């Protein structure tokens, strides 16, 4: 019982400090002080800071990913011989995350939003294995579902576009999205669920957009000339 309490205190302290300072900016000394434990406890329960980060992500990601897979399974079962609509696949991916947040207190939602933003700002080599471990299989299932729903597109195109989906989702629920940075055009006062619905419509259209035989749309000569001029100016 005491061991479980120590473990939970370390996880809670890690969430708070990682959200405030980032993973690389948080020391073991700060973690042990915030959790009121000794250094040996970190190594005993997690093996070190990397193991602690892994447990922090696992605690939040596992229930959400299980719900995502359940929803996708139900979609595919209901579709029978057909394929679920792109919008429904996106909903199955997005909504479990939203429901996870809705079950939390506002302070925890803010904490988890900042934590997610902090983790994604870590060096890629520091988080690639972590993301692959906790989200790789789930994302693969959704990419495969989208590939079947978008059979007219090459698989590599769908792969790339799903990465755009992930990036857009991350930005839409980061603190920076709500900054009023466009004079005269304030941020829409919509609920998280409404924002998700807007996102789904927007992203489904992007996923369905046609591509050339090379996997990209043809760009007008004017745009090519302009982009070339921009690159030349940037090199000066």
Predicted feature locations:
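Amphipathic alpha-helical packing segments from all-alpha helical-bundle domains
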Residues: 88, 107-114, 121-150
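Short, leucine-enriched amphipathic alpha-helices that occur as contiguous helical runs
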Residues: 3, 7, 11-15
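Helix-turn-helix
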Residues: 9, 17, 21-51, 55-63
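Residue-level detector of well-ordered alpha-helical segments, enriched
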Residues: 56, 85, 89, 93, ...
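Short, residue-level hotspots on alpha-helical faces of the histone-fold
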Residues: 55, 59, 118, 122, ...
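Hydrophobic alpha-helical connector segments
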Residues: 70-109, 162
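C-terminal peripheral helix-coil segments that are non-catalytic and often amphipathic
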Residues: 96-99, 103, 133-236
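A short secondary-structure junction motif
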Residues: 63-67, 71, 119, 123-126, ...
């Amino acid at each position: 019982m005491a061991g479980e309490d120590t473990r939970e205190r370390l996880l809670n302290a890690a969430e708070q400090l990682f959200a405030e300072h980032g993973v690389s900016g948080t020391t073991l000394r700060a973690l042990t002080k915030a959790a009121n434990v000794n250094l040996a406890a970190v190594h005993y329960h997690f093996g070190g800071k990397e193991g602690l980060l892994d447990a922090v992500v696992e605690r939040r990601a596992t229930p959400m990913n299980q719900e995502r897979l359940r929803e996708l399974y139900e979609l595919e079962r209901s579709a029978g011989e057909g394929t679920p609509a792109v919008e429904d696949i996106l909903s199955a991916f997005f909504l479990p995350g939203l429901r996870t947040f809705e079950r939390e207190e506002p302070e925890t939602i803010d904490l988890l939003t900042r934590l997610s933003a902090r983790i994604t700002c870590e060096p890629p080599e520091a988080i690639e294995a972590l993301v692959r471990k906790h989200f790789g299989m789930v994302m693969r299932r959704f990419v495969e579902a989208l590939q079947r729903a978008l059979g007219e597109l090459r698989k590599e195109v769908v792969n790339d576009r799903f990465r755009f989906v992930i990036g857009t989702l991350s930005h839409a629920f980061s603190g920076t999205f709500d900054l009023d940075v466009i004079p005269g055009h304030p941020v829409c006062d919509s609920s998280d669920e409404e924002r998700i619905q807007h996102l789904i419509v927007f992203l489904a259209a992007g996923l369905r957009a046609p591509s050339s035989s090379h996997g990209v749309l043809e760009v007008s000569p004017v745009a090519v000339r302009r982009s070339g001029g921009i690159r030349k100016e940037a090199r000066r």
